[in-house]
Amino acid sequence: MGKILFEIGAEEIPARFIPLAISQIEENFKKITSEYRIELESIKVYATPRRLTLLAELSSEQASEEKLVWGPPVHVAFDEKGLPKESAYAFAKAQGIEVDQLQIKPKGKGNYVCAVLSKKGKKTEEVLPEILRNLFYSLNFPKMMRWGEGTLRFIRPVRWFLALYDDRFISFEIEGIKTENKTQGHRFLSENPLNIDRVDNYEFILEKAFVIVDPEKRKKIILTQAEELAKKVNGKILWNNELIEEVTYLVEFPNSVLCSFSMQYLKLPEELLITVMKDHQRYFAIIDNEGKLKNYFVVVSNTKAENEENIKKGAERVIKARFEDARFYYEEDLKKGLVNLLEATKGIIYHKKLGSLYDKSLRIIRIAERLSDRLIPEKTELVKIAANYCKADLASGVVGEFPELQGIMGGYYAKNAGMPEEVFLAIREHYLPKGFTDEIPSNDIGCIISLADKLDHIATFFYLGEIPSGTEDPFGLRRAANGIISILLKKKYSLSLLETVSMIQEFVDEKLKEQISIFIVQRFESYLESTGYDVNLIKTISDFILIRPVYEIKKRLEAVSLFRSKEDFEEFFLAVKRVSNIIKNYEKFELNPELFSSEEEKKLFNEIEKYKENLYEYLNSQQFFEALNYLHKLTPTINNFFDNVLVMDKDEKIKRNRLALLQHLSELLKSVADISRLY
């Protein structure tokens, strides 16, 4: 095994693209080495803003390649005595082997002569330039650029390539840039360039040059430094995984600095301050033990500790200016008030074919009112108030500057206007949930507004023909559908998907409602698959998925899944499957008990009627597992019927009546789920 080091040196790579680069380098290098028949023992990929580095252990040479070359049929190549003919000699010569090295193998309907050729692999060092070029060209990013007069495209201008194998320099070039055995240290803190004579020295040499090349090491340094600084002011860091990752890829040599801001800014909404620090400045906010924001924050710099005072002053000056801007917008919004903000939404176009934001609010009110009358009629007036103002903050200065605070600021403005807690919380939370794992709104009013908003969002874009296809979903319709399902599941509302979609009245006809229903069902099925239910299991409840409450569908699935694991499940399944197979190609027939001519028919009919009556109690209380166990008891009666009754009687009336009896039985057996679809 030999160690390889390949470094791509570039201008500052945007932090958001570095995780993509790391995954591509690892996956593509594995694929390329496999194609070159080189064994890959281990691989690590490091990254900083200025470099992407591959470290790997490879076999010293390619594996030999065997190739099978087909020749003529045996009877053409050899005579009856097995002696080679001219064609055998010609084929062997063409392949560079002796006749006695030819083999005979079956192919199609006969035996053919063939040659098995072995090609010895090259030394890894010989093919590495080609491999590394292919690796570089395989990297692809959403935004690529060209620079200078060359044709090379990359995420940022490439400045150098470093390539070593077994501590030997590998010389080649990519688009005129030659590889070296040199790298660059920190842009401002080190003397460049740096000679790398051994692969194992790479990290050590860079660390001395103020570059921590391993992102995991940088992350640990950031976490440790920041927590220690927060402890100095009796606080703790308000961690955010996305921010940690981003900051890790913004610096090569992390140095965390404790900063502060005036207490007066704590009068502003915490979310506003945190958004300014986190999203706009990439600073870490500090909270106390109760989770309240403190007037301190941590900035992670890309320089040495001796520059801390300058960093601190600069960060505090910037955050003060940002907070002043935020305060100005917030106070101006409060002066305008929620009523005026709502009025301003009349002038904001939601979509040229859908009207203004105010028009959207009116649609949300109407959908929310229908939902509320169905689910929480005693709170319909509060629902209408919340729905009326839920989009008002989109006309505010704060949300204009910080769009991620939509809803949250609306909640603050509603609270300031003296609205009930249920209402301002509903406005604040109505964008929730954004996915299956997110929290849903904390009260029913918020859930109703969220459902109404998401239903309108899906309906209007379906009306415009903007239906998601493939992986594309530019308007977040799948996310909206996921949110609807999540609320219906977690709140256990007695709403089916069909009834939920029926709450939409504007912009949709029955055909479009059907399309929307199918779309949401598909999202529900995807969710169920993601939670571990297999496709066949989900098929068993497909007859109910539109017409029964969402949470009930999940309970039915849980029951079938548990029931399937029983030891005696198989005998019931076979009985159900037999019934299903016999009736599946027939139209619906009318049942006439007077045509029964055997005791088995009468017994089965009487059992069905008895079970229908008793099963209702299980279904009504949603005891679906118990219902399946109860139906299981019918198995002997079903088997007895098939053992003694010929369904396909010569008399057409008798035959149809027996099929009608089995159709009647099938309806009963499918009361919980259609078990016949399992296999």
From Swiss-Prot:
One of its GO terms (biological process) is arginyl-tRNA aminoacylation. This is Glycine--tRNA ligase beta subunit. It holds the Pfam family DALR_1. One of its GO terms (cellular component) is cytosol. SMART domains: DALR_1. Belongs to the class-II aminoacyl-tRNA synthetase family. Its EC number is 6.1.1.14. It catalyses: tRNA(Gly) + glycine + ATP = glycyl-tRNA(Gly) + AMP + diphosphate. Coiled coil: none annotated. One of its GO terms (molecular function) is arginine-tRNA ligase activity. It is found in: Cytoplasm. Keywords: Aminoacyl-tRNA synthetase, ATP-binding, Cytoplasm, Ligase, Nucleotide-binding, Protein biosynthesis. Tetramer of two alpha and two beta subunits. Its main location: cytoplasm. It comes from the Bacteria.
